[in-house]
Design a protein with these regions (language model features):
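Canonical AAA+ ATPase core
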Residues: 1-39, 57-58
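Conserved C-terminal "switch" segment of AAA+ ATPases
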Residues: 21-24, 39-84, 104-108
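Conserved RecA-like P-loop NTPase ATPase core
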Residues: 33, 47, 51, 91
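C-terminal helical "lid" subdomain and adjoining coupling/linker elements of P-loop NTPases
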Residues: 77-140
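Residues immediately within or flanking Cys/His clusters that coordinate Zn2+
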Residues: 142-144, 164
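Short, cysteine/histidine-rich loop/knuckle motifs that typically chelate Zn2+
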Residues: 148-149, 169
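Cysteine-rich micro-motifs
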Residues: 161-173
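Short metal-binding segments enriched for Cys and/or His
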Residues: 172-183
Length: 183
């Protein structure tokens, strides 16, 4: 590393505690790795957006109920699942499980048409947050979206297909594909 330091970049990545143990494992590492970038865990809305992007990439659409249930699923995971909860990998794993459940549901029903294969439903997401989602729906609290530029808040409805919205306050566009729970 010393001989080529003007041409060499070494990047190591991992969870904070394990990276600290790695750096401490050899006295010479701390002086060689002098720059650190912390990436915070994704919020539940961001994990839902990653999930939505994976669905779009694979030509799949979500029912309004699944969009809501997804928010509750990632919210529950963030509060209960520990340090891996805000990890983008969790969104990918959830996507893969949902697609698997959809395939099971459709094959059991003998449905094989292209339209059905392109729609993911709330029943396709097995989630420990299901009771919370059902209670939240009964409460009538609804959902919101926030402009990430100016923090203006708007009501959000899962039945409206609007991945991007324009903020009335600052005039900039922001992601409105998934809302947030009203706490």
């Amino acid at each position: 590393m010393e001989d080529d330091r003007d041409r060499l970049i070494v990047i190591v990545a991992g969870y904070p505690r394990e990276m600290e143990q790695f750096i401490d494992s050899n006295p010479g590492l701390r002086s060689r790795f002098t720059r650190y970038i912390d990436f915070p865990d994704f919020e539940d809305q961001e994990l839902s957006q990653i999930f939505g992007a994976l669905c779009r990439k694979h030509g799949l659409s979500l029912t309004p109920d699944l969009k809501e249930k997804t928010l509750h699923h990632f919210h529950w995971k963030a509060e209960n699942a520990g340090r891996d909860s805000g990890n983008g990998r969790m969104a990918r794993n959830t996507f893969e499980k949902v697609v698997h459940e959809q395939a099971d549901r459709l094959s059991k029903a003998g449905i094989y048409d292209a339209e059905a294969l392109s729609i993911l439903e709330a029943a396709d997401l097995e989630s420990p947050a299901e009771p919370m989602w059902r209670e939240y729906r009964k409460s009538g609290r609804g959902y919101i979206v926030k402009c990430e530029h100016c923090e203006a808040t708007y009501s959000w409805n899962s039945a409206i297909e609007m991945p991007v919205a324009k903020c009335d306050k600052c005039g900039r566009e922001f992601n409105a594909e998934f809302g947030m729970l009203i706490e």
